[in-house]
Regions:
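Conserved catalytic scaffold of divalent metal-dependent phosphoesterases
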Residues: 3-17, 21-34, 38-124
Length: 124
């Protein structure tokens, strides 16, 4: 399974959409995970128009109807295991790991956690 990861695309009416080379790469995916800050329904429609299944979560810059349409977090089930998608890792007592455990409600640890918000790519 090939998964495309997006976050913080900030696509709104009248603003540029994703670069053509990125769109071509995403079309080759089986699933696109968007970790928030799509910004409005226009942006979500642009991502969904790429083709593969899209699972998106809400971010701090999302507005209007989009906030009601998207969940705070999503667990994508893949053949390799569960992938947790959320916008920002919580800054709460106990740290991110404890917060993730609480979000998942004891359903086991995910294979990976995908988040956005920082605008800095990072793999840990």
């Amino acid at each position: 399974m090939r998964i495309g990861l997006l976050s913080d695309t900030h696509i709104t009416a009248g603003r540029p959409v994703l670069p053509p080379k990125l769109i071509d790469g995403l079309r080759a995916c089986d699933l696109i995970l968007h970790a928030g800050d799509v910004c409005d329904v226009t942006g979500l429609a642009a991502v969904k128009a790429i083709g593969p299944e899209v699972a998106a979560v809400t971010g701090n810059m999302d507005r209007g109807a989009l906030v009601d349409m998207l969940p705070e977090f999503h667990v994508a089930e893949t053949p390799a295991g569960a992938v947790l998608v959320l916008h920002a890792l919580p800054h709460i007592p106990g740290g991110a790991r404890a917060a993730i455990d609480r979000l998942l409600g004891g359903h086991g640890r995910p294979l990976a956690v995908v988040h956005g918000h920082t605008h800095c790519p990072d793999v840990q």
